[in-house]
Amino acid sequence: MGASATLLEVRELGKRFPPRQGREPSPWVIQDLSFSVRDGEFLTIVGPSGAGKSTLLNILAQIDTATEGEIVFNGASVTTRDPRALKPGFDRRIGYVTQDDNLLPWRSTLDNVLFALEVQGRLNEETRARAQMLIRAVGLAGFERYYPHELSGGMRKRTALVRTLVYDPPVILMDEPFAAVDAQTRTQLQADLLKLWDLGRKTIIFVTHDITEAIALGDRALVLSRQPSRIAAEHPIPIPRPRNVRDIFALEGFAATYEKIRADVQ
């Protein structure tokens, strides 16, 4: 992708949880962690289990505070040490897709997608049309009035993805969103995600354990070390877009990139 402005910067981030009464301070989960993300970049992050990947995303989403360091969004610091001052999602500037779809069981597919817009007071003819467009883009047309228990796991994941994209946040955090589905469904969800990303090229930070997934989706992959987590390596993904994720193993540059990342993860 071409050069673009830095949208999000993480500067010497550190996180340790408060000690329990009468105990020693907890070890650092994250320490001296720094990276930046460009506007419109698809950044993937891989690392061993327990490397603090979810903790990092929670801090970026302002669900949790950092112990030290700074987060800069679009040139302005959004760092806070006070849990009472947290603003989850930076006032709608950050979307967050987790492993769980968290769909409301009493709302239909369409109503789940529209929920965030309702809460934000942004539900109107234009945003409703955007919701319908995204629903069609991921193959959910005809299932708008189905309830979560009537949907397959993959369809629930697509609904959760569209629910986040519909309010058009400039940054989207994704914490292993496809980890719980079978391989075939996962490949289709990856293809759906790339299709949606290509519609608007929002900045995505995507955490995964799967090196193949990191390569198939990302412009660049960061490797986290074991705790205390830092950036152990950075790998540009030399595979041009558009990509067919079903053919990723056969694409030039995949095998060499996979081996480099695997060596750094280990």
Walk through the language-model features, giving the residues of each.
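Conserved ABC ATPase "signature" region
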Residues: 76-77, 114, 118, 125-143, ...
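Short coil-to-helix segment of the ABC ATPase nucleotide-binding domain corresponding to the Q-loop/switch region
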Residues: 107-115
